[in-house]
A protein has these predicted regions:
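Non-transmembrane, aqueous-exposed alpha-helical and coiled segments at domain scale
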Residues: 6-153
Length: 153
């Protein structure tokens, strides 16, 4: 489940407002569309939990992008984008996503901060995910197989 929060500061540098978008269903409620509408109003866009199990499709400047890990505030110049402690990152998917954005001129080094405490999905997590799902037989839950659950445990 992807969760995103926003924050803005007043002229004295104090936090004046923070809004949080939570997915309370099964993770595919259209949070991304709400995030896209709200990001221009905030200085900080942060993902604080979730992983790359779904893609958020966006169109900016006539180009189509699919974001799985990077907050969509990256398209709003001058915004700080944060990947927080509770996020699980797949380094391979993250790198591909970052390279696509870099090709289009989005400088992640100036707009993106990643917590040192964010969790990394390893190949063993994906293998465990598949094994746990297979072991459940007809009681399986329909995991995406991306290793997100085992990374959190």
């Amino acid at each position: 489940m992807q969760k995103t929060s926003f924050a803005s500061k007043n002229t004295t540098g104090q936090m004046k407002k923070a809004d949080v978008i939570l997915g309370l269903q099964w993770g595919d409620e259209g949070k991304g569309k709400v995030v896209d509408v709200l990001t221009p109003r905030y200085e900080v866009v942060a993902r604080f939990q979730g992983g790359p199990n779904a893609g958020h499709t966006l169109e900016f400047g006539g180009e189509k992008y699919i974001l799985r890990s990077i907050p969509s505030g990256i398209f709003q110049g001058g915004k700080t984008n944060i990947i927080g402690n509770g996020v699980v990152l797949d380094a391979i998917l993250f790198r591909a996503e970052a390279e696509e954005l870099a090709k289009s001129g989005h400088d992640l080094t100036k707009q993106l901060c990643i917590s040192k405490k964010a969790h990394l999905i390893l190949p063993t997590h994906r293998m465990l995910d598949a094994a746990y799902e297979a072991a459940k037989g007809s009681a399986k839950i329909g995991t995406t197989g991306k290793g997100i659950g085992p990374t959190y445990t």
